[in-house]
Amino acid sequence: MDVNTERSVFYISDGTAITAEVLGHAVMSQFPVATHGVTLPFVETVQRAQAVKAQINALYQQSGLRPLVFISIVTPVIRDIILQSDGFCQDIVQSLVGPLQQELGLLPAPVANRTHGLTAGNLSKYDARIAAIDYTLAHDDGISLRGLEDAQVILLGVSRCGKTPTSLYLAMQFGIRAANYPFIADDMDNLKLPAALKPFQHKLFGLTIEPERLAAIRQERAENTRYASLRQCRLEVGEVEALFRTQQIRYLNSTNYSVEEIATKILDIMSLTRRMY
């Protein structure tokens, strides 16, 4: 098969389809093939399932290539309709349920939307995640330095090095209360750790970035300005990294990492307990 030939990939669920997407993407990332993804959540009725089956079959007829179909469907009748399509179907949950049933000696009690839905059993975890998101938004970009005793991590770094997206990902994905504080150009003449942060040194974590990458990012926001110049970026990165070393603040170069990787590395380095939702 030509790796440049685009394959259609379906992620189908009678719930949010998050499980199908995550596991499907993980599997597809192992293959050097171009894909076009179609995510179909809440396929909960026979009529909808029949329409999805027809969509898969039509694509197969048009392209001559079987669409790749990852499903996470609890309802048997809905699942069977999709499995009868012309797609190459992978039931990513049921393939694990059988062996686990044998090991546990228990029959599964499947319930739609249990994984990512709101139930009595996970309500407290959901509330904790919303509280973490609220906290992170209120402590983004140095907006407030109050309540830092409640932070689980405080990210530091120059402007546009990835502090805000990483903080939000930590809050939304793991329920981590993350504050972040920026060092700006005006700080560089006499860069030091703000007094409000010193009592929480054990919570501080630095993000840095290659100056060339930083300049490219800033050029998109403020083209041909001192703020976006390579010289200014080199100055700021150098000064901030020196501060991290002087203050013995652990830090990570974010240049070649995704937000997901940065957040996970922070959890590991800071020994923070992850809470999956």
Swiss-Prot record:
HAMAP family assigned: PSRP
Keywords: Kinase, Nucleotide-binding, Serine/threonine-protein kinase, Transferase
Catalytic activity reported: [pyruvate, water dikinase] + ADP = [pyruvate, water dikinase]-phosphate + AMP + H(+); [pyruvate, water dikinase]-phosphate + phosphate + H(+) = [pyruvate, water dikinase] + diphosphate
Protein name as catalogued: Putative phosphoenolpyruvate synthase regulatory protein
Enzymatic class: transferase
Lineage of the species this protein comes from: Bacteria, Pseudomonadati, Pseudomonadota, Gammaproteobacteria, Enterobacterales
Family, per entry: Belongs to the pyruvate, phosphate/water dikinase regulatory protein family. PSRP subfamily.
Annotated source species: Erwinia tasmaniensis (strain DSM 17950 / CFBP 7177 / CIP 109463 / NCPPB 4357 / Et1/99)
GO molecular function: ADP binding; ATP binding; phosphotransferase activity, phosphate group as acceptor; protein serine/threonine kinase activity
Protein EC: 2.7.11.33, 2.7.4.28
Record-listed ADP binding positions: 157-164
Domain of life: Bacteria
Database matches in InterPro entries: Kinase-pyrophosphorylase, PSRP
Database matches in PANTHER family: PYRUVATE, PHOSPHATE DIKINASE REGULATORY PROTEIN 1, CHLOROPLASTIC
Function field: Bifunctional serine/threonine kinase and phosphorylase involved in the regulation of the phosphoenolpyruvate synthase (PEPS) by catalyzing its phosphorylation/dephosphorylation.
